[in-house]
Structure formats: C-alpha cells, structure tokens
Amino acid sequence: LVDALEGCTTFAIHSTQSYAEPFAVIDSMDEVTRAVAPHLPVDAVIQTDAFTEGRLIEHPHTLEVEAGLQGSEAAADNAYWLARAFLAATGAISAPGADDVLDAGGREDVSVFRLRERIPKPDAEAYEVFARNFERVEAGERFAAADGEPLLADEPFYPVLLSSNGYRDQFGYVADRVGTLE
C-alpha cells in the first residue's frame, strides 16, 4: 500500500469512541496540511509527532480525519462531507456553492493541538471520563476515574481522544494547544 501511495496526497477517514464532531489527525504540520486542512469541516487538528509509528499517517502527504462517533449516522454523514471537502481542497471537484475548483473556501480559526504523552489506564473494572476533548483541564482537576478512584491532572493540559472505552490500556492523550491553522 505504501508503494502505491508514494507521491500521492492521501486521505484516511475513521470514526472514534471519543468525540462526536470531526477532527483531523496529522503527523506534522507540512505544506499539504496547511493547504488542505483549512478547507475541511473539522473542529481541530491534532499533530501526533512521536505517536505515529506503524500507522499510515507517518508517511508524507497523509491526512487522517475522525468523522465522529463509531457506528453513528452523524459520522457517516460527516465522512461524506469530509471527503467532498478534501476533494475540493485538492482541486478534484468544485466545493458546494463554488463556481470552480479553485474556489474551495477556507478558514484559519481551527485550533491545532500537539500530542505530548499518553494517559495510561490503570487496571480496573469500570472507567469514567469527566473532561471533554479539546477543553483545557487545570492542574489538580479530576479528568477521569478507574473503579471510582479519581485521576487528577498534574499540570494543565488539553485531552485528546479521551474516552473511557476507546483504548484498552490508555484513556487518551495529553496535548498542548499550539495555535491555529495559518
């Protein structure tokens, strides 16, 4: 697959158990991300950096998106519009309401977050999450629990892919908000 995609701009659509709205996932902020991401109907862009090993996203010119909650009709609808937006942003089709393929719109108000570390999930029977993805958690604030035992933030952070049941061995990721798309 990697050989077949060499030199291509690649778009991968997934769904998640952590967040209902679409967001983009990239390896690093490159020219493809800067050109395409502002045209996608996403809430945020996640820069994964060191957390890409073995994933398609570690290859150049690859954008991934999470379309919404797994199995939801909204995620399926979002996937359709994400695919259309990607095709319009890359000049393959006209954007809805645009006169030609060059008029794909765009915005700069999309927040960019960089993953810093994993949030491990201790062995437990029941997990809870109290924080919301992409919303700042303050130092000392309870953000999750394992068998009723609270997990408190050591320092401020933004949770990303935070879910009680998304990953077997981790709640999600600690991230920093590093700015907006430029």
Task: Name what the model sees in each region.
Residues 1-182:
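Structured catalytic-domain cores with a bias toward divalent-metal coordination
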